[in-house]
Amino acid sequence: MELNSEKISQNYEGILQDIKKYSPYPEKVKILFVSKYLGIEEQEALINMGYNYFGENRAQVYRDKLERFFGEKYENLVWDFIGRLQKNKIKYIITNVNLIHSIDSFDLLSEINKKAIENNRIVNGLIQINVSKEESKTGIYIEDFQKESEKYFSMSNVKIKGFMTMAPLDAEEDEIEGYFSKMYNLKKEYEKKYNYCSELSMGMSNDYIEALKNGATILR
């Protein structure tokens, strides 16, 4: 697959303009390139275009790409993990992940903390919230998180930097607005208690405008 660098650049610039237009704090917003469909050559092409913030959703592919893109040339690359993470796959990402977006249960958080201790690392993570309560999605309901939030922030080697969510693909614009507004309020609630809990990962190509209006800091 050959990448259309001109189209990518135009789309990127368009999103940058939307960030300035719609975000309450545009200086805090980051654009994450979801690289799960990219092979090594396509990834290299994006890197050569100057993009350096990537999200991968398969743990073993994450490991393989970081082994490939290693060394001085690639030292400014930032890699997040955005996919569903199985406990037995944590080992593939734990040594160098920048941010885990998909902590969808306390059990998973505890296991990540255990592996982080073993590797002498402090790992940054986001709690995945199932804001729409879809049965087909993983994630924690807002009210369930609020009931037991202290234990999520008590891990010795995992720092909860904020929250991640996805709106239903078939949701109407006003529904999406409602879901993202709930997430913004949740983030504000916990940022007051933990000033490092400042990230809100939400908004993809079909709904990022609504996400920006509601304080998203990471667009995927």
Label the model's feature ranges.
Residues 1-206, 212-214:
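Conserved alpha/beta-domain cores
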Residues 217-219:
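Divalent-metal-activated hydrolytic enzyme cores
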